[in-house]
Swiss-Prot record:
One GO MF term attached to the UniProt entry: hyalurononglucosaminidase activity
Protein name: Hyaluronidase
Keywords: Hydrolase, Secreted
Tissue-specificity statement: Expressed by the venom gland.
Cellular component annotations (GO), alphabetically ordered: extracellular region
Enzyme class at the top of the EC tree: hydrolase
Upper lineage: Eukaryota, Metazoa, Ecdysozoa, Arthropoda, Chelicerata
Catalysed conversion reaction: Random hydrolysis of (1->4)-linkages between N-acetyl-beta-D-glucosamine and D-glucuronate residues in hyaluronate
Organism: Tityus stigmurus (Brazilian scorpion)
Main function: Possesses high activity against hyaluronan in vitro.
Compartment(s) of residence: Secreted
Length: 24
């Protein structure tokens, strides 16, 4: 895996959850 990409995905996923949006 690519830690950088995974970290970025995790951050964006958390951001979507914070905004009550779904992440596709």
């Amino acid at each position: 895996e690519h830690p950088a990409l995974y970290r970025r995905y995790s951050k964006e996923h958390t951001f979507c959850k914070t905004k009550n949006q779904x992440c596709n």
